[in-house]
């Protein structure tokens, strides 16, 4: 490990270097997904996900209040409006019933749902994805606390349109 770190420090390629490419390939293979992009931090990953989906001023993003500040910071950074919904008392993960209620009652056009997986437990993505499909909304999974978990042999990273981790 020390030799690998020294190699990165010696060649000065912190961005787009061979180690980053290897990391992205390994991450994709581990999560059984097609692509991975290394970012400097989880906040930047969330911002890039929102930008990739062309989310900005006038758009709403449904998420939860029980999260690290980066979730809301990313939404506001692109000019979108956070639309907060309640979580399950038992898991603190987003409640899909509240998501659908928020979509129907929102004053802004909802363009994405951003579940935040907590304590190693992925959100209820099957239900969330059904709602997203019904309303033609994208799902951005924040898997900073669940990466490595799986449900029915499907790895976190493969449940949403875009998943971020840090």
Q: Residue ranges of each PLM-predicted region?
A:
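Phosphate-binding glycine-rich loop
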Residues: 13-60, 74-76, 84-86, 154
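N-terminal "arm"/small-domain region of PLP-dependent enzymes with the aminotransferase-like
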Residues: 1-13
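Short glycine/serine/threonine/alanine-rich loop segments
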Residues: 33, 80, 137
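Structural detector of well-ordered beta-strand residues that form the stable sheet scaffold
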Residues: 37, 62, 83, 139-140, ...
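Alpha-helical elements of Rossmann-like donor-binding domains used by nucleotide-donor carbohydrate transfer enzymes
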Residues: 4, 22, 26, 48, ...
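Active-site phosphate-binding strand-loop segment of PLP-dependent enzymes
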Residues: 90-166
